[in-house]
């Protein structure tokens, strides 16, 4: 990729005011060896970040940024993540990955707007962009002040982006429990308190956040949900899922596209490591905010620390973990659904058919865990057929994956009954639908052995 000396063209109003240029100048001046040149363009001085990365001091500012943006753009175009007719919701947590994801989506929108204005027929519309921030104050009351400051910072960051304007949705995590905020907050706290395991509590909150994002996306007409998950986070997820016994559903979580949800999820930063993203934030002066909402004593934090240690010893370790896991067979929903909509350009429809992943028909599943929404093997959900309608807690236990049974669900019957009463209505309805689907599947398999109403036993 050739060096682009014209700059980033991000369109951010306050880039200079936030001292982004000063950061770049300081980084370049700290390079030490001014006689060396960028290994890509062979003309500009390389950047030196001093973070100990294996490629530190090899690329100039423009080439480094173009390299990271090129990975993002390749993922978007190859998997048809964003098309002109789409309405995209970017999940923004304030961290470095989500900040870069928002910036890159913003730049794609600016380019689409310029192409639209320069076109004579203006046949390709400009895709819409919204931003969603999940407010976790109800789950972490001690961080209420920090959360308020973070929300104000998010509002300011989104407002500083140049036109087209982007709607910001601040979503309380308890909103999925109902419109009554007090009752919803009470149910959330009781639900989390009923989970005895720290890792299970953290995982449950993560699932509730995803439901909150899906809810706001569906209610506001978005058809894509962009997450900022990078290679580093996915590598950690591969190991944690393996430790938790989620091997069957692992391949569903690590693909570029996940359409098992009502609003498909896309991961355009899947091929970018955290070090690259952190450097880009420093280079472009992209400010971030981190909230200490994560448990420091669970499996997730332990595995993240382990992967970070591996990465220090071998800079390619995270990529190796993700590439190895990517060899698993994807599910049928790990692709953007093909469409015959006349509003979608033919080039986009051809791209969907060309780049969609090939999957094994045996990986087709209609059963999903009501807690984590992980795909279930038919043998895992066969216990649903043995319960009556009145045994709601037992049906819930049978409908969940083995990992959620072990880490999230209470083990004794009375606590499980209480736990199920606190769950959001969405999860309860999914359990009921799953039981009906399981019974229909069982009837389909044994239909040749059933007698019709007008038949007699011989």
From Swiss-Prot:
Q: Name one GO cellular component term.
A: cytoplasm
Q: Which Pfam families match?
A: CTU2
Q: Which spans are transmembrane here?
A: none
Indicate where this protein resides in the cell. Answer: Cytoplasm
**Gene Ontology molecular function: any one:** tRNA binding
Keyword ATP-binding applies: no
What keywords would UniProt list here?
A: Cytoplasm, tRNA processing
Question: Superkingdom of this entry's organism?
Answer: Eukaryota
Do you know which InterPro entries this protein is assigned to? CTU2 (IPR019407), Rossmann-like_a/b/a_fold (IPR014729)
This protein's pathway reads:
tRNA modification; 5-methoxycarbonylmethyl-2-thiouridine-tRNA biosynthesis
GO terms (BP aspect): lateral root formation; protein urmylation; tRNA thio-modification; tRNA wobble uridine modification
Q: What is its main location?
A: cytoplasm
Functional description taken from the UniProt entry: Plays a central role in 2-thiolation of mcm(5)S(2)U at tRNA wobble positions of tRNA(Lys), tRNA(Glu) and tRNA(Gln). May act by forming a heterodimer with NCS6/CTU1 that ligates sulfur from thiocarboxylated URM1 onto the uridine of tRNAs at wobble position.
Question: What family does the database annotate?
Answer: Belongs to the CTU2/NCS2 family.
Checking PANTHER family in the record gives: CYTOPLASMIC TRNA 2-THIOLATION PROTEIN 2
**Protein's UniProt name:** Cytoplasmic tRNA 2-thiolation protein 2
Organism from which the protein derives = Arabidopsis thaliana (Mouse-ear cress)
């Amino acid at each position: 990729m050739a060096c682009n000396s014209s700059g980033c063209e991000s369109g951010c109003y306050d880039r200079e005011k936030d001292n982004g240029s000063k950061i770049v100048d300081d980084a370049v001046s700290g390079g030490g060896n001014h006689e060396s040149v960028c290994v890509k363009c062979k003309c500009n001085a390389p950047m030196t970040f001093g973070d100990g990365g294996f490629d530190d001091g090899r690329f100039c500012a423009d080439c480094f940024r173009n390299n990271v943006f090129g990975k993002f753009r390749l993922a978007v175009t190859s998997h048809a993540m964003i098309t002109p007719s789409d309405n995209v919701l970017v999940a923004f947590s304030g961290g470095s990955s989500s900040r870069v994801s928002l910036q890159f989506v913003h730049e794609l929108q600016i380019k689409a707007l310029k192409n639209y204005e320069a076109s004579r027929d203006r046949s390709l519309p400009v895709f819409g962009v919204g931003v969603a921030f999940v407010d976790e104050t109800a789950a972490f009351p001690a961080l209420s002040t920090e959360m308020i400051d973070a929300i104000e910072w998010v509002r300011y960051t989104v407002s500083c982006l140049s036109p087209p304007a982007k709607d910001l949705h601040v979503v309380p995590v308890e909103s999925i429990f109902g419109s009554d905020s007090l009752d919803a907050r009470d149910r959330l706290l009781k639900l989390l308190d009923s989970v005895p395991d720290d890792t299970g509590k953290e995982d449950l909150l993560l699932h509730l956040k995803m439901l909150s994002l899906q809810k706001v996306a569906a209610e506001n007409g978005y058809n894509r949900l962009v997450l900022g998950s990078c290679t580093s986070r996915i590598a950690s997820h591969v190991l944690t899922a393996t430790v938790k016994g989620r091997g069957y559903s692992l391949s569903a979580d690590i693909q570029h596209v996940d359409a098992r949800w009502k609003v498909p999820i896309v991961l355009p930063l899947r091929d970018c490591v955290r070090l690259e993203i952190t450097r880009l934030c420093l280079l472009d002066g992209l400010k971030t905010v981190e909230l200490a909402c994560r448990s420091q004593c669970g499996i997730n934090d332990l595995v993240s620390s382990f992967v970070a240690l591996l990465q220090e010893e071998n800079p390619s370790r995270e990529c190796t973990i993700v590439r190895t896991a990517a060899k698993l067979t994807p599910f049928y929903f790990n692709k953007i659904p093909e469409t015959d909509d006349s509003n979608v350009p033919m080039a986009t429809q051809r791209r969907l058919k060309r780049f969609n992943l090939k999957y094994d028909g045996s990986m087709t599943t209609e059963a999903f865990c009501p807690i984590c929404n992980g795909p279930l093997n038919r043998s895992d959900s066969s216990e649903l057929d043995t319960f009556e309608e009145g045994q709601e807690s037992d049906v819930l236990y049978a409908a969940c994956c083995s990992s959620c049974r072990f880490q999230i669900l209470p083990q004794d019957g009375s606590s499980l009954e209480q736990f199920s009463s606190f769950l959001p209505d969405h999860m309860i309805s999914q359990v009921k639908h799953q039981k009906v689907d399981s019974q229909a599947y069982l009837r389909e398999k044994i239909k040749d052995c059933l007698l019709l109403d007008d038949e007699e036993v011989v």
